[in-house]
Amino acid sequence: MADNMTTTQIEVGPGATNATINFEAGILECYERLSWQRALDYPGQDRLNRLKRKLESRIKTHNKSEPESKRMSLEERKAIGVKMMKVLLFMNPSAGIEGFEPYCMKNPSNSNCPNCNWADYPPTPGKCLDDIEEEPENVDDPTEIVLRDMNNKDARQKIKEEVNTQKEGKFRLTIKRDIRNVLSLRVLVNGTFLKHPNGYKTLSTLHRLNAYDQSGRLVAKLVATDDLTVEDEEDGHRILNSLFERFNEGHSKPIRAAETAVGVLSQFGQEHRLSPEEGDN
């Protein structure tokens, strides 16, 4: 089964998160304008309402992780999102967008833009995936939790109990787990804790996630070059479970970095947000 696996590498930064939220806000603005023209059918109206609720929730959660000077309302993000659409549609890489900084690389074969092939600039200048060390950085007194032959419910509880006894700051978590008695995965995670007034500690920021198969081969690497801040726990109900399943089945669909991060976080004191049917495997 492991022979069917491929290495998935993902790079994520705060700029990409803001760009995505702003772009979706621009889409919402377009939906609303279409609705004003009475051009949306019932499924379209339903999608508009669901998108608005989702964005309001995501913006509220995301703003908590931003300095007060950088927090924006939905209306402010709509305006930026519309600007983004104009830049994207007219393929103007020199325009620049808040939270979305394009750059050019010479590529004469690109028919859409003869002089350049543009993309969003890596959040940490000069550092791309190939430049980042494969293993998560070493941390002092890392905690190691071993999970074997354990269902999801018990595994989550053990992780919660073990992790919440650790100190603040960065940590490394190793999860060794058998999957359907076929594949044992080793997952290394770096992150940062926040200590709340009541003494409860929660994982607030995910820095790195590596996953290895039983032969020690890296099968997935989640990298946050600037730190990946969790956006919305509701996105992560079943992501960690599906992450294991994808490794086991050699799934070809790329693993979304943000969803994976939120999924990992949902295992740390966020059990109440997990869907009841996830239960035991």
UniProtKB/Swiss-Prot annotation:
A motif (Nuclear localization signal) lies at residues 50-55. Residues 1-93 are annotated as: RNA-binding and homodimerization. GO terms for cellular component: host cell cytoplasm; host cell nucleus. The keyword Magnesium does not apply. One of its GO terms (molecular function) is RNA binding. Pfam families: Flu_B_NS1 (PF02942). The keyword RNA-binding applies. Homodimer. Interacts with and inhibits human G1P2 conjugation by UBE1L. Binds and inhibits the conjugation of the ubiquitin-like G1P2/ISG15 protein to its target proteins. Since G1P2/ISG15 is an early antiviral protein, NS1 may inhibit the host antiviral response. Prevents EIF2AK2/PKR activation, either by binding double strand RNA or by interacting directly with EIF2AK2/PKR. Also binds poly(A) and U6 snRNA. This is Non-structural protein 1.
